[in-house]
Amino acid sequence: MSLISKKIRNSARGQNCQVRIPSVCNHNSETVILAHVGKGSGMGQKCDDIHATYACSACHDVIDRRVRQGSANEVMVYAYEGMVRTQKLLLEQELIQVAK
């Protein structure tokens, strides 16, 4: 079962890119979407929406390896750092919560 949230996906609209790959990021908030980081549970499956980052179209292309820029490991570091920043924003927007 995947964790899918339309509210989290829609929250990406107008946000700043949180991946910020140097010499790649277009810094255009109009192109930002919720990009999934990592693998799902099977071939062709996406991971949960909580394992995602706000990414501009250029950074998203590199994360998904449609554009080859840097090593896969280097790209994943940027993606995971972006995921952490995105999770902080989702907490601030009260779209996710941590149990007390």
Residue positions per predicted region:
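Short Cys/His-centered divalent metal-binding micro-motifs
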Residues: T53-S71
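Alpha-helical and His/Cys-centered functional microenvironments
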Residues: G40, D64, L91
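Short Fe-S-cluster ligation motifs
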Residues: D49-A55, A79-K100
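Short cysteine/histidine-rich zinc-coordinating motifs and their immediately flanking basic loops
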Residues: H27-G38, R66-V75
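Intrinsic-disorder-associated interaction segments
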Residues: M1, M76-A79
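Short cysteine-rich loop/turn motifs with clustered Cys
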Residues: S2-I33
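Short linker/helix segments within small regulatory modules
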Residues: G38-H51
